[in-house]
């Protein structure tokens, strides 16, 4: 019997059973990066969240029956500006090429280090300009778009049938006018109309314009995703502009961050539904929550802007020189993944250096168990039903981690390894390589003894035997073990985690 999946659907604002349009080709689209700068840790969150969704769907429906498209935006005004700034001595188009190739390559390295599977496809905007022009032509023909001063704009007032503009974001037009930063150009009929195509200035990248416009131009941001999702998830399966059946022009899941709900996803829906005559673009919309750094909004002005690359390169760990090079490069990535997955994807996430260190220490202890029991681990990929149940309930990764900790505590290396594999935390080859110490100075105590000491100390604290409890802490500290007390976020009980001191 196929596992029942339930996800929170932003479209309906409630948790619903997920039933794919066709279980032999489950289709997922996620908005990817604009390659003008290195991805930051806020970008890492949707990468990891939707990788978990991709892994779960593959587990339930089969790896050959899930199609995951994540786009690459390589046409954008921010790209033009950054390229001109970083490569002032190059022609703009060459500068853009160098910038986008460099940042695209780093993005791929980042996603691999974070433990993410490659999507089925990663369409680039520049590879789908023909589809964008065709989609804009369709909107012009149907009266949903108009030309003005060599621009083509989407007409909000042209929408007469559901979904009405603003319904997805749950905002009225007045609220959107008041809350959005809108470029009210003189050529717009209404202030909320948005650009589908714009003219390119001399020297800027430009392509043949739709609608008979005589000058070269480039697409707006929103039309890119409508066109690329059509190209990868609709047209190959009977949908697209040559199909008159609205049902064939809907796919299963569209994902992204909360910050994309308005205006980007609202505008995607307006474009796609108007072009195809559908009431929805995708049946499910899933959005991950925001990320803060040390309790503050991440911002260059706050000095807390952290790129994924900086996490990977400026390692927060001191590695033993004998440790395999790949582990040195990717341990920080898996530690970041471990840290992020402990918070439910729809909840706000507070990124802290302390939490990252704790995640790294715990992940290492898990690998130690796998190393110690590797001879007992059979070639068995069966995953505990309880773990699948947790992820099937709106990707409940905190509950999944509770189960993994139980497997670890019970010494069940096989269940732990299979669960880690599903969550993208397992590198089989590392189990062999990790025989050498991770840290430059490693304690002589084994992890089992340390856990026993922690349990005894917690008992002493419960009995208010403070002196004896402090003695255990001090003795462990002398061996290079740092104890950190806190509360379990679910039970509220006192817990203690440990890590090896940095020297």
Curated annotation (Swiss-Prot):
GO molecular function annotations of the record: ATP binding; cysteine-tRNA ligase activity; zinc ion binding
Cofactor mode of binding and number, as noted: Binds 1 zinc ion per subunit.
Residues binding Zn(2+): 31, 225, 264, 268
Motif ('KMSKS' region): 297-301
CDD domains for the chain: CysRS_core
Record's keyword terms, sorted: Aminoacyl-tRNA synthetase, ATP-binding, Cytoplasm, Ligase, Metal-binding, Nucleotide-binding, Protein biosynthesis, Zinc
Annotated localization: Cytoplasm
GO biological process: cysteinyl-tRNA aminoacylation
The keyword Nucleotide-binding appears for this protein: yes
Motif ('HIGH' region): 33-43
A GO cellular component entry from the record: cytosol
Binding, ATP: 300
EC number: 6.1.1.16
Source superkingdom: Bacteria
Entry keyword annotation includes Transmembrane: no
Pfam families linked: tRNA-synt_1e
Cofactor(s) demanded: Zn(2+)
Catalytic reactions on record: tRNA(Cys) + L-cysteine + ATP = L-cysteinyl-tRNA(Cys) + AMP + diphosphate
Enzyme class name: ligase
NCBIfam families listed in its UniProt record: cysS
Homology family: Belongs to the class-I aminoacyl-tRNA synthetase family.
Quaternary context: Monomer.
Protein's name in the database: Cysteine--tRNA ligase
Protein source organism: Bartonella tribocorum (strain CIP 105476 / IBS 506)
Gene expressing this chain: cysS
């Amino acid at each position: 019997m196929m596992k029942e999946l339930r996800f929170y659907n932003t479209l309906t604002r409630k948790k619903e059973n997920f039933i794919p349009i066709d279980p032999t080709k489950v289709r997922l689209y996620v908005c990817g990066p604009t390659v003008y700068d290195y991805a930051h840790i806020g970008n890492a969150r949707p990468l990891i969240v939707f990788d978990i969704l991709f892994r779960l769907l593959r587990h339930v429906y089969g790896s050959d029956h899930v199609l995951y498209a994540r786009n690459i935006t390589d046409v954008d005004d921010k790209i033009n500006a950054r390229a001109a700034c970083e490569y002032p001595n190059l022609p703009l188009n060459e500068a853009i090429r160098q910038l986008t190739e460099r940042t695209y390559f780093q993005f791929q390295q980042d996603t691999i280090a974070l433990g993410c599977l490659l999507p089925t496809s990663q369409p680039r905007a520049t590879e789908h300009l023909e589809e964008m022009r065709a989609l804009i032509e369709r909107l012009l023909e149907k009266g949903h778009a108009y030309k003005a001063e060599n621009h083509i704009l989407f007409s909000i007032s042209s929408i007469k049938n559901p979904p009405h503009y603003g319904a997805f974001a749950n905002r009225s037009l007045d609220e959107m006018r008041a809350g959005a930063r809108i470029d009210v150009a003189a050529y717009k009929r209404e202030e909320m109309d948005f650009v589908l195509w714009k003219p390119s200035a001399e020297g800027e990248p430009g392509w043949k314009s739709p609608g008979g416009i005589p000058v070269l131009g480039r697409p707006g941001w929103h039309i890119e995703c409508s066109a690329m999702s059509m190209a990868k998830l609709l047209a190959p399966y009977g949908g697209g502009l040559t199909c008159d059946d609205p049902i064939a022009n809907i796919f299963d899941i569209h994902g992204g961050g909360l910050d994309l709900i308005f205006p980007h996803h609202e505008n995607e829906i307006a474009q796609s539904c108007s072009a195809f005559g559908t009431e929805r673009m995708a049946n499910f919309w899933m959005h991950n929550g925001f990320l803060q750094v040390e309790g503050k909004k991440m911002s260059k002005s706050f000095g807390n802007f952290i790129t994924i690359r900086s996490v990977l390169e400026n390692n927060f760990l001191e590695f033993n020189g004998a440790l395999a090079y790949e582990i040195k490069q990717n341990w920080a990535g898996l530690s970041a993944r471990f840290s992020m997955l402990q918070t439910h994807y729809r909840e706000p996430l507070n990124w802290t250096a302390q939490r990252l260190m704790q995640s790294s220490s715990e992940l290492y202890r898990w690998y130690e168990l796998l190393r110690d029991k590797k001879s007992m681990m059979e070639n068995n990929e069966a995953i505990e039903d309880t773990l699948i149940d947790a992820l099937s309930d709106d990707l409940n990764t905190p509950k999944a981690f509770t189960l993994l900790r139980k497997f670890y505590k019970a010494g069940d290396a096989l269940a732990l390894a299979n669960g880690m594999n599903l969550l993208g935390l397992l590198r089989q080859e590392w189990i062999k390589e990790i025989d050498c110490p991770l840290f430059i100075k490693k304690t002589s105590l084994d992890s089992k003894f340390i856990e026993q000491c922690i349990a005894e100390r917690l008992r002493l604290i419960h009995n208010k035997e403070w002196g004896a409890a402090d003695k255990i802490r001090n003795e462990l500290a002398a061996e290079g073990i740092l104890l950190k007390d806190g509360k379990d976020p679910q039970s509220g009980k006192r817990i203690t985690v440990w890590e090896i001191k940095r020297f």
